[in-house]
Amino acid sequence: MQRRIMGIETEFGVTCTFHGHRRLSPDEVARYLFRRVVSWGRSSNVFLRNGARLYLDVGSHPEYATAECDNLVQLVTHDRAGEWVLEDLLVDAEQRLADEGIGGDIYLFKNNTDSAGNSYGCHENYLIVRAGEFSRISDVLLPFLVTRQLICGAGKVLQTPKAATFCLSQRAEHIWEGVSSATTRSRPIINTRDEPHADAEKYRRLHVIVGDSNMCETTTMLKVGTAALVLEMIEAGVPFRDFSLDNPIRAIREVSHDITGRRPVRLAGGRQASALDIQREYYSRAVEHLQTREPNAQIEQIVDLWGRQLDAVESQDFAKVDTEIDWVIKRKLFQRYQDRYNMELSDPKIAQLDLAYHDIKRGRGVFDLLQRKGLAARVTTDEDIAEAVDTPPQTTRARLRGEFISAAQAAGRDFTVDWVHLKLNDQAQRTVLCKDPFRAVDERVKRLIASM
């Protein structure tokens, strides 16, 4: 499958402070954030005009699920649009607090752990063909996902009783299973719950919940692009060396704690390989695969960055990727800060900086400031993101959903939508079932809109 439907779901951390002290509980902050949403959507679980879903997840975490996308830059753009949608709610909520005489600063963090040790996720979704052998996909994909933090981790300072250490991944400490049908209780790497949101006879949806939330656009593109490319190679029957891990959960932590990528991890049968070895195998197969697939500039861009990042890890000289990979950008920032102020990695100010990196408010968040200075690479523009806040992807089913929602809102009609259904809540209860996520034009939807 060279054209693939993809989407990203992001849970955001939330807090409200007043002069540095916590002002409201996360529950209360979430209520203020979603008050405007509830006023027009009558629910804290809504679909937006751009085809995305916005809702309040377990534990007071606002969650934004992008609309269906079918190319990488489109997906990165819609992922960033989610940040802007949430930032807009943040500004509105702060104004409500001020109007009520409460005061306080609301923070939304696109990260994966809070100070209490709780974890929340960034989930990737990839449409795969039902006819494929799911167990083979899992077997080949698992070693890739365990080691890919080397190329797309968000970076984190982990405080241990002995010392503070810089880790590649925020999520690695919180994953407890390899493949499972649960997402919250056990936190697997690949979630197998079969909800395709499409024609179940043709497709299933691969739900990857091991990834970090990325701030850097090129890192997000690399994370999703490499996974989609590995899936494409599996579907095409490309042979891979067997890197089945003895204990994926131990391995994911070991990889996260080793920025050299050289520490050996145990494979099934007593063999060993390093994260760098494993990633090199997938990368070299990808380079070969590019010779046989139809040319695609976005795929070529991510394979180029993949190779440069692996070279950088191997040489430990990150100068050629230090604006493109989240954990590299963050580590460089910490090192500069430590050198300037002569402080240890365990200093609370570094922990503050770690958190501030993920603050999504423009003009305040540290990552945004780095990006404005040209210290973080981009693949989108602000104009494209602004358009994606209100406009669905034009090449997928999301277009139908977005146009239906816009028309129903403009006509003042009561409606219900989900990923596959568009329904007018009138006497006739007219419903259109959109089972093909690749289909952006549908006469049935046009007629439903015209009937308003």
Swiss-Prot record:
Annotated gene: pafA
Swiss-Prot/TrEMBL GO biological process terms: modification-dependent protein catabolic process; proteasomal protein catabolic process; protein pupylation
EC number: 6.3.1.19
Other observations noted: The reaction mechanism probably proceeds via the activation of Pup by phosphorylation of its C-terminal glutamate, which is then subject to nucleophilic attack by the substrate lysine, resulting in an isopeptide bond and the release of phosphate as a good leaving group.
Lineage top rank: taxon: Bacteria
Protein name: Pup--protein ligase
Binding-site positions, ATP: R53, T66, W419
Keywords from the named record: ATP-binding, Ligase, Magnesium, Metal-binding, Nucleotide-binding, Ubl conjugation pathway
GO terms assigned for molecular function: ATP binding; ligase activity, forming carbon-nitrogen bonds; magnesium ion binding; ubiquitin-like protein transferase activity
Residues given in the record as Mg(2+) binding sites: E9, Y55, E63
Annotated catalytic residues: D57
The reaction(s) this protein catalyses: ATP + [prokaryotic ubiquitin-like protein]-L-glutamate + [protein]-L-lysine = ADP + phosphate + N(6)-([prokaryotic ubiquitin-like protein]-gamma-L-glutamyl)-[protein]-L-lysine
Function description: Catalyzes the covalent attachment of the prokaryotic ubiquitin-like protein modifier Pup to the proteasomal substrate proteins, thereby targeting them for proteasomal degradation. This tagging system is termed pupylation. The ligation reaction involves the side-chain carboxylate of the C-terminal glutamate of Pup and the side-chain amino group of a substrate lysine.
Family of the protein in this entry: Belongs to the Pup ligase/Pup deamidase family. Pup-conjugating enzyme subfamily.
This protein's pathway: Protein degradation; proteasomal Pup-dependent pathway; Protein modification; protein pupylation
